[in-house]
Structure formats: C-alpha cells, structure tokens
Amino acid sequence: MARARRVKRDSATNIYRTCKQAGTCPPDVINKVESTTIADKILQYGSAGVFFGGLGISTGKGTGGTTGYVPLGEGPAVRVGGAPTIIRPALVPDTIGPSDIIPVDTLDPVEPTTSSIVPLTDSTGPDLLPGEVETIAEVHPGPSRPPTDTPVTTSTGGSSAILEVAPEPTPPSRVRVTRTQYHNPSFQVITESTPTTGESSLADNILVTSGSGGQTIGGATPELIELQELPSRYSFEIEEPTPPRRTSTPLQRIQTAIRRRGGLTNRRLVQQVSVENPLFLTRPSRLVQFQFDNPAFEEEVTQIFEQDIEDFNEPPDRDFLDVQRLGRPQYSETPAGYLRVSRLGQRRTIRTRSGAQIGSQVHFYRDLSSINTEDPIELQLLGQHSGDATIVQGPVESTFVDINVDENPLSEDFSAHSDDLLLDEANEDFSGSQLVVGNRRSTSSYTVPRFETTRSGSYYAQDTKGYYVAYPEDRDISMDIIYPTPELPVVIIHTYDTSGDFYLHPSLHKRLKRKRKYL
C-alpha cells in the first residue's frame, strides 16, 4: 500500500484569516496568532513583578531589541524605577515680558465756548551786533636821567689808528635728514644699492672719503684683525629642524593610529587588495559599476551600490567584483614612510533564502609615491632697486662694416643714376627648394620649417633614418626568372620580396607513408 504524500500546511496567519469567521480554526493557530500560548502567558504574568526593559524577549525573532545584544561586562546597566534627572541651566533665566510703561501726560479738554483765535504779542528779536566797548589807556612816563658828559681823548701822534673788529659768532648749524615711508603690503622697496665715491642714492649708509695720503698721529699702527661682513636686513636663513618634520602637526595620536591600522591590515579577517587605477583616489564608484559622472556629488563618504542578485554585471575593474558597500577614504602612513589611501569595502557574494547577503570585507588601498626634495634655490625680492641693467636682443644685433664714405664705387664703371641698377639678376640659391628623402619604391616627403629672420637662412633636415640618393635616370630593375634543369623540381623565388623567405612547391613536400597495422 502506497503511503499518502504529506502536504505542508499553510502558514498560521493565512489560516487564521480564513477560518476565524467560520469558527473552524485549530487551537494551535489561535494560540499562536492571538499570543495565548503557555510561554506568552508566563511572560504576561511575570511582567507584573519583573521589568525586562527593551530587551525584546518574546516568541518572535531574537534581535536583541533596538540596540542589539550587549556582551556581558560591557555597556551601561539598566536602572529600574529610577527618577529621570532634570538638567537645570547654570544661569538664572530672565523673565521675558513687555518693557516698563512710560506714563503719557494728557491734555485738558478744550471747552466749546473757547475762542479759536490765537492772540499775537509784539516782541523784538535779539541784538546780534556787539555793543559799545569802553577803552581805558593810562600812560606812565619813565624816570628822567641827568645828561652825562663823555670825555673825548685826542692824540696827535704820527701812527695810524687800527681797529680790531671781531666777527659775531655764528651758531652751529644742525642738519636733520628724515625719510618717510608708507607701508604697502603689495609693494616693497629695496633701499640698498652700491654707493660710489661722493655719490649716494637710495642707500641708508653715506660714505665720506677724503684724499689719499696723510700722517698717523699717536702710537704704533694697530693690528689688523679679520672682520665679519654684517648681513643685510633683507637676507635671512631658514633653519631646518634635524631630523626634518614629517607632518605639519608634531603631536601624533599613536594609540588611534595603531588601533585603526590593526583593523584594516588584519589578513585573517580582511582581504587586502592593492589598487593601481588612479580613479580610486577621485572617482572610486567608476571602478564598481558603469555610471555617469555627477560633478555635484562628492565621493568622500560611504557609498552603497544596489544591484539585483539575479542580474550579473561585469564591473570595470575585476578587483571590485560583487562590492556592495565602499567606505570613506582613510589616510595612514606605511612603514616605508609613504602615504596610503584606504577604503573598507563589503562584498555580497552569498545570498540566503531569507534575503540576507553575506560577503567578506575587503581592504582596498593605494600607496602614493614620495615627493623627492630638490636643492633650494636662491630667490630675489621683487621691487625697485638701483643697479646696472643690460638688455640683450639677439635678432636686432647690428653689424659694423668699415667703408669709406668719400669713395663712390659706382662712379668707375657707369653713372650712379643708370638704369642698369633696376635690372634684377636671378640668383639660384635654392631658397625655396624641397628636400625629398626616400627611394623609388617608398617615397616619404618631409616638410622643412622656414623661419623668417634678419640673419642668414638656416635649414633643418630630419636625421632619424638613412639617406637614399635618387639619381635622375631610369633603370630596368626587372629580372628574368632563371629556371633550373628539367631533372629538378621547379622552385619559384620572388625577387621583389625583401623579407628573405620563400614558398616551397607542393611537390617538394615530404610524403608521409601510411602505416598499416596487421592483426
């Protein structure tokens, strides 16, 4: 007797929808849908005395609540029945309301019998002119002095009188030299120059020299010592630290760098993939799927790529196959001292029956090359400075010819006003010729550039291949085929073939003998 085939029953939810109205639902379906099972009743009765918080313990799927499961010994504890903490402001709040009301004076009402005519009063304006000023002057005469008689001495000697007149002392003159300079950040004036004897211009130092020669007054000549040149205020040196700095901020968080590096470089959990495509730095999404560039979108954030698992699309780069999530860029330093740009990706290789996608984590990275340090060069300040300027212009150089202007070379043969000077003699100098390089079979033409200049003409020819001399004559290059004697097979050799190979006649091929196997 054949066993009847077992048919799987429909889900409890669908059965409950159809049998609830008819009242033919099985007890297990009602208990499961209406949550009246033994486990549900235990939780309902036990929740009256025990509070489990948001752990989400029930007959449903175990998700651990909204925040997931927390390992033991980690995370904050759950406070049962605690009062919430009220956060009060540190400052005393001010009451917000209307400002102080200013009282307004009211005017007395005007009676109806009051006249509306305003009487005018006569008044004089203020006097703006000054008044009379009283002048009082008192004169006090000085004391009177009696006249004095001055004796006059007269000498009758024969000598002349000599009067010594001393000039009035001249006060010393003080000379003050000032200079005013306005600071302009976009313009800098260099006031240094090379002064000459008796002349100074735009210099802070003034040298006064006298004639050569002289005598030394005093002891012996002092000993000459070596002097050091004082540097200018515009010259300075930048001291480089030893060893040179490798980052702009010397403070480095070692623990954070080690923790971040350990998570990405763990080869047991994360696959390591080195990317050589430069699009990984600017447009990494173009390595995962074909798409159009959006200038308004910045790819400095985590990107998620949605793709149907049934449709297989080949990515532009095979290293980014089945990539569903590509993280933001992370920068780190390699042991060799290079800068590394990393992105953590998630593949979707396997898909379960419930719809979940499972895949491994991939660490995509690219190491940037180092920047070689070059020798520093001396820079000059831009501004005004005094000095000699030399201007050299090659195309306009002049050529001096020593001729005698008194002699007329045209006066020996004919008159300088003869019509023979108007005749144009054609000189074949091949100035407009074209150079053809090549043989008769393959002729290549090269365009020679011609530059307009006041100097003599210069021509340039390409010197990258061998030269072929083309003679202006005809040659018969056709060669007759030399046939061998009738005893030998015919071998045709193509003489115009320059490859050095030949075609063998089919009759010259070696015949293969058929081997028969006898039983």
Curated annotation (Swiss-Prot):
Residues 150-159 have a biased composition (Polar residues). A motif (Nuclear localization signal) lies at residues 1-10, 510-518. It comes from the Viruses. Disulfide bonds join C19-C25. GO terms for molecular function: DNA binding; structural molecule activity. Keywords: Capsid protein, Cytoplasmic inwards viral transport, Disulfide bond, DNA-binding, Host endosome, Host Golgi apparatus, Host nucleus, Host-virus interaction, Late protein, Microtubular inwards viral transport, Phosphoprotein, Viral penetration into host nucleus, Virion, Virus entry into host cell. It holds the Pfam family Late_protein_L2. Highly phosphorylated. Its main location: virion. The keyword Phosphoprotein applies. InterPro entries: Late_L2 (IPR000784). It is found in: Virion; Host nucleus; Host early endosome; Host Golgi apparatus. One of its GO terms (cellular component) is host cell nucleus. The keyword Phosphoprotein applies. One of its GO terms (biological process) is microtubule-dependent intracellular transport of viral material towards nucleus. Residues 137-175 are annotated as: Disordered. Belongs to the papillomaviridae L2 protein family. Interacts with major capsid protein L1. Interacts with E2; this interaction inhibits E2 transcriptional activity but not the DNA replication function E2. Interacts with host GADD45GIP1. Interacts with host HSPA8; this interaction is required for L2 nuclear translocation. Interacts with host importins KPNB2 and KPNB3. Forms a complex with importin alpha2-beta1 heterodimers via interaction with the importin alpha2 adapter. Interacts with host DYNLT1; this interaction is essential for virus intracellular transport during entry. Minor protein of the capsid that localizes along the inner surface of the virion, within the central cavities beneath the L1 pentamers. Plays a role in capsid stabilization through interaction with the major capsid protein L1. Once the virion enters the host cell, L2 escorts the genomic DNA into the nucleus by promoting escape from the endosomal compartments and traffic through the host Golgi network. This is Minor capsid protein L2. It comes from Human papillomavirus 14.
